[in-house]
Curated annotation (Swiss-Prot):
Residues 48-103 form the bHLH domain. GO terms for molecular function: protein dimerization activity; RNA polymerase II cis-regulatory region sequence-specific DNA binding. Transcriptional repressor which functions as a downstream effector of Notch signaling. Belongs to the HEY family. One of its GO terms (biological process) is regulation of DNA-templated transcription. GO terms for cellular component: nucleus. Residues 1-59, 193-264 are annotated as: Disordered. Residues 121-157 form the Orange domain. Keywords: Developmental protein, DNA-binding, Notch signaling pathway, Nucleus, Repressor, Transcription, Transcription regulation. This is Hairy/enhancer-of-split related with YRPW motif protein 1. It holds the Pfam family Hairy_orange. Residues 30-47 have a biased composition (Polar residues). Induction: Expression in the developing embryo is induced by activation of the Notch signaling pathway.
Amino acid sequence: MKRNHDFSSSDSELDENIEVEKESADENAGANSPLGSMSPSTTSQVQARKRRRGIIEKRRRDRINNSLSELRRLVPSAFEKQGSAKLEKAEILQMTVDHLKMLHAAGGKGYFDAHALAMDYRGLGFRECLAETARYLSIIEGLDNTDPLRIRLVSHLNSYASQREAHSGLGHLAWGSAFGTPPSHLAHHLLLQQQQQQGAPLARSTSSPPSSNSSSPSSSSPSAPSTEPRLSGTVISEAGQTGPLRVPPSTSLPPGLTPPTASKLSPPLLTSLSSLSAFPFPLSAFPLLSPSSLGPATPSSSLGKPYRPWSMEIGAF
């Protein structure tokens, strides 16, 4: 009896082998029969089995092609090369094996952390959007690879994607820990500002201890106007003075009254600010405010224009 050697890997492989063996047996029986030919019903069954085999084989090939397309989209190295040239199936499988080896060598680091996994998929999505943007510029807008606008835009997006990938390895902080420290740090200065306005009508330093706010208004000294730390060139006024007093840029303040700079911020604030660099929005959209500018405006009529750095950043949102 003729044996079947079909090496199909479909789900219904066993049924297909059984059907082929029956078909071969029917053919052999028909050849050895005295009539020497098969009946019409047997011929129709054989043709139906052949058609069914073709459908099963087509489904198997479609499933393989769909899986290869998913691998080409998910593997970073294969995804970056899909726009330049058509990848063969062997190349896609090889890149997948290399990617899995790299993950195995790294011990699966990052793929057990939900935040790191989301950041990884975000990078893949950004790369996919970058490829779609380049395709749109070339097909719809008609910009070739030598166009300066296309070169500038694509290089900017590539550099941004590289920075995102570099910043994703700084530390996996949640959104709450990244934004938890600055509000508490600023709330301390707001509390001091409220105590200052309730205790004395004169402007006082927010960096001074709260015990200095309990002094009477009549004990103000000539150095009282300079106790309010502001940025250089801003107005420092007092309720009893008739004209504003400006601090030149070269004026040196006492060590305890220096304006807050990025190098003298508290370590938790610096840590939270450094963690913010891993997120998409720039820090320039949120300028550091001086503590004295966070309180409500004083009723003095000699105050200059209020310090509002956010008015220049409204367009960023």
